[in-house]
Amino acid sequence: MNMNPRHNIREIRAPRGPELSAKSWMTEAPLRMLMNNLDPDVAENPHELVVYGGIGRAARTWEDFDRITAALKTLSEEETLLVQSGKPVGVFRTHKDAPRVLIANSNLVPHWATWDHFNELDKKGLAMYGQMTAGSWIYIGTQGIVQGTYETFVEAGRQHYDGNLKGKWILTGGLGGMGGAQPLAAVMAGACCLAVECDETRIDFRLRTRYVDAKARTLDEALAMIDMWTKAGEAKSVGLLGNAAEIFPELVRRMKAGGPRPDIVTDQTSAHDPRNGYLPVGWTVEEARAKRESDPKSVEIAARASMRAQVEAMVAFWDAGIPTLDYGNNIRQVAKDEGLENAFAFPGFVPAYIRPLFCRGIGPFRWAALSGDPEDIYKTDAKVKELLPDNKHLHNWLDMAKERISFQGLPARICWVGLGDRQKLGLAFNEMVRNGELSAPIVIGRDHLDSGSVASPNRETEAMKDGSDAVSDWPLLNALLNTASGATWVSLHHGGGVGMGFSQHAGMVICADGSEDANRRLERVLWNDPATGVMRHADAGYEIAVDCAKEKGLRLPGILGN
């Protein structure tokens, strides 16, 4: 008999097609997206309810998963389900325009917001780590981070290499749910990529889904591939089986001895969770898995020391004049806590490359076809091009995405668009559902990593102009406004991306079912959501955001005086 409430060998896949298993599309949508998060083609470890990002789960236990799905199937259009850290705790009477689901995951009072306290609660069955889109049921597989990574690499190429990454190579670590986007994003940006990953099954998964081109078992083998591709001007990627905390320092040693040097260095190991996400040097994956059960503290101590070694190497690359960036997994903070004083010598990716986009409310807009039909996504791709004819960069992205990105679970698309354009696209998609161009409704959401929905001083809000990095009123206001505006489900999480104590963030998803009611909700939600990002950055003193707010006619009395 299985006594672990978080383990089950069931295979979960979202229903496809126009038939409902809930009372309306407003409850069918969260039901399908929750199930899609645990699709074996989507989730990193679905049998343990883990979607991505270390232990980012979709539900607290399998019993909770069953209770959530049962509640969603019976929920009326005037009721709202409350989910507390992956557990369905209440159904309350609300109204038709209210969210059908409100979710709060992993939130702790600040003084107690530590991994030690969270792990204690988690062990007792009182909490669940929701990451960002795992516990908010809008994870779309590795595609969800591809364009953001692509935009980052393109901007790095523009700043450091005259906009041309041909013949250049990027060194990184981690091929999990988020990190797995890096090799494909690098190739799309015109560069080669060497990605170090300690778990061979993850490399094989990325090979199968065409996110990485080749696998190597030794550093020499991987470097030979990189050398061949860069000399030929080809953009290709290799996943190297190894530990980043060993490979990065070894590459520094070789570089100092006149060996190969990468052109850009970053990392997306699951360093945000030292206990569950990072493999210590000298340990096997199996050994770490066993020790996490028998002696979790020893894993954490060893992992932290290894992270310091990796960051020391990254600082050495930076000191050698190589563009080096933290990709938001809090690895610099851990290294600093371990005594590495100059751990923050190199910048995070948001202040270095992404913030000007956030100032205009531009961020990771995404949608999924509840029909399960890829043609619905291809039709929406065409609609995006039609409605945004002058955005050639976006057109290029959509063309590459169609050619290179394999759908995982329900077909989905991500594209970075901003204030005004999100609303325009959402209304157009709703019209396509209404007139039968699409075979079923779609859901529209985003990552919590967005312009106005997150406070994370070591990632999205690092080095804010006015010093407001740690002010977390903004994601709270974002969640409240999306609730008031009529999003289909709204989530408020803590600790995503960078780990306990380092972030608070909000998510929203809205269903376009073709109705007039949906039209009104889409109009409000898809304007207000990115507008909070423009507001937040305008308040911090960014001129781009101030200009955008004025151009779009935002009323910001305490900021613009209107």
Swiss-Prot record:
Location relative to the cell: Cytoplasm
Gene (UniProt): hutU
Zinc is among the record's keywords: no
Cofactor: NAD(+)
Residues reported in the UniProt entry to bind NAD(+): 53-54, 131, 177-179, 197, 202, 243-244, 268-272, 278-279, 327, 497
Family: Belongs to the urocanase family.
Known pathway: Amino-acid degradation; L-histidine degradation into L-glutamate; N-formimidoyl-L-glutamate from L-histidine: step 2/3
Top-rank taxon: Bacteria
Coiled coil (residue ranges): none
Protein name as annotated: Urocanate hydratase
One Pfam family named in its UniProt record: Urocanase
EC nos: 4.2.1.49
Cofactor: binding details: Binds 1 NAD(+) per subunit.
Alphabetical list of InterPro entries matching this protein: Urocanase, Urocanase-like, Urocanase_C, Urocanase_central_sf, Urocanase_CS, Urocanase_N, Urocanase_Rossmann-like, Urocanase_sf
NCBIfam families: hutU, PRK05414.1
Assigned keywords, A-Z: Cytoplasm, Histidine metabolism, Lyase, NAD
GO biological process, one term: L-histidine catabolic process to glutamate and formate
UniProt-annotated catalytic positions: C415
Catalysed reactions, semicolon-separated: 4-imidazolone-5-propanoate = trans-urocanate + H2O
Any one GO cellular component localisation term in the record: cytoplasm
An example Gene Ontology molecular-function term: urocanate hydratase activity
Biological role: Catalyzes the conversion of urocanate to 4-imidazolone-5-propionate.
